[in-house]
From Swiss-Prot:
InterPro entries: NA-bd_OB-fold (IPR012340), Primosome_PriB/ssb (IPR000424), ssDNA-bd (IPR011344). The lineage of its organism: Bacteria, Bacillati, Bacillota, Bacilli, Bacillales. This is Single-stranded DNA-binding protein 2. It holds the Pfam family SSB. The gene is ssb2. Residues 107-160 are annotated as: Disordered.
Length: 160
């Protein structure tokens, strides 16, 4: 069986950060995700998907994402239920995020958004490793940028 969700969208409001009685951080937010098709009027509609993220990633989401920030969410669908104050059973369907990626640079129009990604995965490596590679700042920052000259490539070298 598989339960996997990957979403890219914009936050509809600032994330809500709370702490459990045990002190565990939990953030909730709603992601507006455009549908791939248009309705009868030719307009693109959106789905509003509730998301929840736990622990340190929850604090990062609350600190760096704001209303309008673009984010990528990788997680699973969860359905839970509880009894409200009136004694009625309420069902909630949400995405439990295992990873939230901040998809806009810090200096973008959305205040507080960041391009740093936080992956909440056990197999995420390179956390404490140092690299011996040093960037040469005297070189151009984009080595693939075109200077307006045609690129000389032999078609036999292309993989397609």
């Amino acid at each position: 069986m598989m339960n996997r969700v990957v979403l890219v969208g914009r936050l509809t409001k600032d994330p809500d950060l709370r702490y459990t009685p045990a002190g565990v951080a939990v953030a909730t937010f709603t992601l507006a995700v455009n549908r791939t098709f248009t309705n009868q009027n030719g307009e693109r509609e959106a789905d509003f998907i509730n998301c929840v993220v736990w622990r340190k990633p929850a604090e990062n989401v609350a600190n760096f994402l704001k209303k309008g920030s673009m984010a990528g969410v990788d997680g699973r669908v969860q359905t839970r239920n509880y009894e409200d104050n009136d004694g009625k059973r309420v069902f909630v369907t949400e995405v439990v995020a295992e990873s939230v990626q901040f998809l806009e640079p810090k200096n973008n129009n959305v205040e507080g958004a960041t391009s740093n990604n936080y992956q909440n995965k056990a197999n995420y490596s390179n956390n404490n490793q140092t690299s011996s590679y040093r960037a040469d700042t005297s070189q151009k920052s984009d080595s693939f940028a075109s200077e307006g000259k045609p690129i000389d490539i032999n078609e036999d070298d292309l993989p397609f």
